[in-house]
Regions:
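Conserved pre-ATP/AMP-binding loop-to-beta segment of ANL
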Residues: 29, 33-34, 65, 69-70, ...
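Conserved AMP-binding/adenylate-forming
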Residues: 74-77, 92-134, 214-224
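Short beta-strand->loop structural element characteristic of the AMP-binding/adenylate-forming
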Residues: 106-108, 115, 119, 123-161, ...
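Gly/Ser/Thr-rich phosphate-binding loop
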Residues: 237-240, 247-307
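Conserved ATP-binding/catalytic segment of the ANL
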Residues: 304-333
Length: 333
C-alpha cells in the first residue's frame, strides 16, 4: 500500500513538472514570436536587410582594410590599424585569462578609449559585453548565470602590450547573437549585433555622414548611447575622433546634434534633435523622421516602437510578455 501511494505521488510530481515545462516552452515561443513581430517593419523582416558587415567583429576588420593608415583618434594619435592591433591584443589577453567565446563579460570601469578597445576585443572573441553601470557585480551575478568578471591591475594598454596582434578567431558571431546586455534600465536590455549595426547605419543615413569627418562626442562611458555614438559610429563611418576642431559634435545639449530622451515631447523636437529610445537600440528619429527601418506610434501613456532596431528583449521574459504587444514594443513615458 505504501509503495502504491509513493508511486502515485512521484507520478503526479512528474506530470506537474512536465506540465510546467510545457507551459514554459509555450510562453517562450509566444514571446519570441511577439519580439520577432515587433522587429519587422512592413514586409521587411529583421536581418533580411543586409548591413555591410555580418557582426561587430567583421566591422572592425573591414574598416581597418578600408582606412588602415587614416587617423582614427587624433587625441591619442591612433590610426585605424593601431586600433585594430590593440583589439587583437586584447582578445589574446582575454583568452589567456580563461575567457571563452559566447560568454558574457562584465565590463570594468575604464576611460573612454580603453573601454572602446576592450569592447571590440570582447566582440572579436565572439562574446557579449555586460554594462552594469550603477549595479554591483554581486547584483549582476545574481541575475546572470556564469557572467565573467574582468579585472585589471594596471591600464589596459600596459596589460596587453606583450600580447600578439595576430588573433585566430575560434568563434564568429552571427548577426542575431547577443552583443550587449545593459543594465541602464533595471530590467536589463539585450541588443544583438544586428541591432547595433542597423541603428548606426540608420544614423549614418539620416545625418549624411562622410568618412574622414572630424567628430567629437562626450557621453557617459558604458551607456547605450556611448556604445552607439562614441564607440561604434566613428569606426563604422570612418570618422576621426577630435576634440580640438571637430566638424561634427553629438551630445546631450549645445551640440550640432543633441540627444533627447524625453519622448513625451518628441513632436516638439528640433531638426537637430535625435530622439533616443534605448529599447530601440539608441536612435529612434532624427530631424523629425524615424531612422531607416524604424517606426513608432505615440500613445497616451507612452510610445510603441517597431522595426529592425527593436531590442532582443528585456532580460526578464515576464516583462517581455507585457511590453511586446500589437506587433510592437510599448515603452512608457
Amino acid at each position: 500500500m505504501t509503495y502504491y501511494f509513493v508511486y502515485h505521488r512521484v507520478q503526479k510530481q512528474l506530470i506537474n513538472f512536465q506540465l510546467k515545462s510545457f507551459i514554459g516552452f509555450i510562453m517562450k515561443t509566444d514571446i519570441k514570436t511577439k519580439i520577432y513581430s515587433a522587429q519587422c517593419i512592413g514586409n521587411v523582416e529583421p536581418i533580411e536587410y543586409m548591413t555591410p558587415y555580418p557582426s561587430m567583429r567583421s566591422l572592425i576588420e573591414g574598416q581597418t582594410i578600408k582606412f588602415s593608415d587614416q587617423m582614427m583618434n587624433e587625441i591619442s594619435n591612433i590610426t585605424n590599424q593601431n586600433f585594430f592591433d590593440f583589439v587583437m591584443q586584447t582578445s589574446n589577453w582575454l583568452q589567456s585569462i580563461g575567457i571563452e567565446p559566447k560568454q558574457r563579460i562584465i565590463m570594468p570601469e575604464l576611460e573612454y578609449l580603453e573601454s572602446q578597445i576592450l569592447l571590440f576585443g570582447i566582440w572579436n572573441m565572439g562574446c557579449s559585453a555586460i554594462f552594469n553601470l550603477d549595479h554591483s557585480i554581486e547584483n549582476i551575478n545574481e541575475r546572470v548565470v556564469d557572467a565573467q568578471t574582468v579585472r585589471l591591475n594596471e591600464s589596459l594598454f600596459n596589460t596587453i602590450k606583450t600580447y600578439s596582434n595576430k588573433y585566430l578567431a575560434r568563434h564568429k558571431p552571427l548577426l542575431s547573437d547577443e552583443a550587449i546586455l545593459s543594465f541602464e534600465k533595471e530590467s536589463g536590455i539585450r541588443l544583438s549585433h544586428y541591432n547595433l549595426l542597423i541603428n548606426v547605419n540608420g544614423i549614418e543615413k539620416a545625418i549624411g555622414l562622410k568618412n574622414k569627418t572630424r567628430f567629437h562626442c562626450d557621453l557617459r562611458t558604458g551607456s547605450i548611447c556611448w556604445i552607439i555614438f562614441q564607440a561604434i559610429l566613428p569606426v563604422h563611418c570612418g570618422l576621426i575622433y577630435n576634440n580640438k576642431n571637430p566638424e561634427l559634435t553629438i551630445g546631450e545639449s549645445g551640440k550640432d546634434y543633441n540627444l533627447r530622451h524625453d519622448l513625451n515631447n518628441i513632436s516638439k523636437f528640433s531638426s537637430n534633435d535625435i530622439a533616443i529610445c534605448i529599447e530601440n537600440t539608441a536612435a529612434l528619429s532624427i530631424n523629425g523622421k524615424p531612422i531607416h527601418l524604424s517606426d513608432y506610434d505615440i500613445l497616451d501613456d507612452g510610445i510603441r516602437v517597431r522595426g529592425h532596431s527593436v531590442m532582443m528583449g528585456y532580460l526578464d521574459d515576464e516583462i517581455n510578455e507585457v511590453a511586446f504587444e500589437n506587433s510592437g514594443l510599448k515603452v512608457s513615458f
